[in-house]
């Protein structure tokens, strides 16, 4: 197994998480905006009909807790990511052939939704990184979640440029090829559940390394799923996650169309979206290091409140310069959110059952990420403007940034009334 003084196998886990997050976010959020106008023109799909697409993710809710349990099982994550990526890639190829809205709903909404649920960039990747890293968790989570922003920096331009040079059908086909080639082989080769499975400890220690054993000891006590569900802290974190997603997803979903509504061509909208994604990518490492050194509650507030305020800046923007400025500022603060949440959960609940815990939080994320873009489409239909929608989404960020103040410090679970034996 690959491990030496200079290299830790866990960084391969981070690499796969980065790639999976990049493809998932790129094809599911950043790139989708480029298809709204051309598919709408050719197939007669309205903005509101496009906004229904995320609702099909609701079909995956019953299986998400089960997928979370599988992540905590040996070889479960490897099978999930490889199979999900293959299904997702095939679904994207099928989307290039659609002729009406219902075919689009089936191929992209249902089939691709099932594939990405199994791919689990926000379930599998952060859960595995939590298991493989403790002292270096902030930086590892930052690099892994950089893939989310890389979806906008790398995957979205692939879609946008392919559509501009060819057509939207070629755009879907290009995304299909990238999904299968970039994820399936690395997932099969590199994904392992936890360092203990290959006689290692988190952060690069071995079972015989006393120094790492000492640093590993505080992480031994982990909350089970049942203990977590009985905790007030768990539900506050779930609400913070929901509010952050409500501010993040619909802005990514509608930003391209909003910029085009302001009179800018697709190429300029691509530049703004790319700038936002690049800024979000760059911000993850600083927020990751802050999460290792500061109280994670303060880091959450430092990220979410400015993310909300900066959301409002796109509303008065009327020039390319002001749009680029918005992309830089909002992208920086918005981009730190997945990294900080990835660190916060294992900081409070430990790492052993993180897959099961995230498997319960994931349905909440799915519901919010499904309905919030639809709400944006409804508000646009009311007055042909996204102004009220962006005010609402910015406000959810700010509320989410205030909630960490209601959290106490991390503490061990109360085991008196919990059954630890079942590991749930």
Predicted segment positions?
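Helix-loop-helix hairpin linking two adjacent transmembrane segments in secondary transporters
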Residues: 148-197
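Hydrophobic core of transmembrane alpha-helices in multi-pass small-molecule transporters
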Residues: 22, 91, 103-119, 322-335
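Symmetry-related core transmembrane helices of the 12-TM Major Facilitator Superfamily/SLC fold
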Residues: 172-189, 388-406
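Cytoplasmic helix-loop-helix junction between adjacent transmembrane helices
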Residues: 112-146, 350
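Central cavity-lining transmembrane alpha-helices of secondary-active solute carriers
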Residues: 54-69, 274-286
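Helix-to-loop junctions at the C-terminal end of transmembrane segments
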Residues: 64-76, 283-295, 380
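Extracytoplasmic gate region of multi-pass secondary transporters
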Residues: 28-37, 226-287, 372
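C-terminal ends and interior cores of transmembrane alpha-helices
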Residues: 86-99, 306-318
């Amino acid at each position: 197994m690959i491990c030496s003084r200079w290299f830790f196998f866990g960084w391969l886990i981070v690499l796969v998480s980065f790639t999976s997050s990049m493809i998932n976010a790129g094809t599911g959020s950043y790139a989708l905006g480029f298809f709204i106008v051309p598919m709408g023109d050719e197939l007669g799909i309205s903005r509101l009909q496009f906004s229904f697409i995320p609702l099909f993710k609701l079909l995956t809710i019953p299986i998400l807790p089960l997928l979370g349990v599988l992540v905590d099982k040996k070889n479960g994550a490897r099978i999930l990511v490889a199979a999900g990526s293959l299904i997702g890639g095939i679904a994207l190829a099928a989307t290039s052939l659609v002729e009406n809205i219902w075919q689009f709903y089936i191929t992209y909404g249902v089939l691709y939704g099932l594939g990405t649920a199994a791919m689990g960039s926000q379930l599998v990747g952060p859960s595995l990184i939590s298991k493989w890293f403790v002292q270096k968790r902030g930086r590892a989570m930052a690099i892994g979640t950089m893939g989310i922003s890389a979806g906008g920096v790398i995957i979205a331009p692939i879609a946008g440029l392919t559509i501009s040079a060819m057509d939207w059908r070629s755009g879907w086909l290009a995304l299909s090829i990238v999904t299968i080639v970039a994820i399936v082989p690395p997932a099969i080769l590199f994904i392992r559940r936890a360092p203990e499975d290959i006689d290692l400890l988190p952060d690069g220690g071995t079972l015989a390394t006393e120094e790492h054993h000492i640093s590993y000891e505080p992480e031994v006590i982990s909350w089970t799923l049942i203990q977590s569900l009985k905790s007030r802290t768990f539900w506050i974190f779930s609400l913070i996650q929901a509010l952050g997603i409500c501010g993040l997803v619909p802005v990514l979903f509608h930003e391209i169309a909003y910029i085009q509504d302001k009179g800018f061509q697709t190429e300029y909208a691509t530049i703004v979206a790319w700038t936002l994604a690049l800024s979000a990518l760059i911000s993850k490492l600083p927020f990751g290091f802050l999460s290792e050194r500061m109280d994670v509650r303060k880091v959450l507030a430092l990220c979410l409140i400015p993310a909300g305020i900066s959301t409002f800046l796109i509303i008065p923007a009327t020039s390319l310069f002001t749009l680029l400025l918005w992309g830089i500022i909002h992208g920086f603060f918005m981009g730190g959110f997945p990294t900080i949440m990835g660190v916060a959960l294992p900081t409070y609940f430990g790492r052993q059952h993180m897959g099961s815990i995230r498997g319960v939080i994931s349905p909440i994320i799915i519901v919010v990420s499904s309905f919030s873009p639809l709400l944006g489409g409804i508000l646009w239909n009311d007055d042909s403007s996204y102004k009220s929608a962006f005010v609402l989404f910015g406000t959810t960020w700010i509320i989410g940034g205030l909630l960490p103040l209601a959290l106490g410090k991390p503490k061990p679970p109360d085991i008196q009334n919990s059954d630890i034996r079942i590991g749930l």
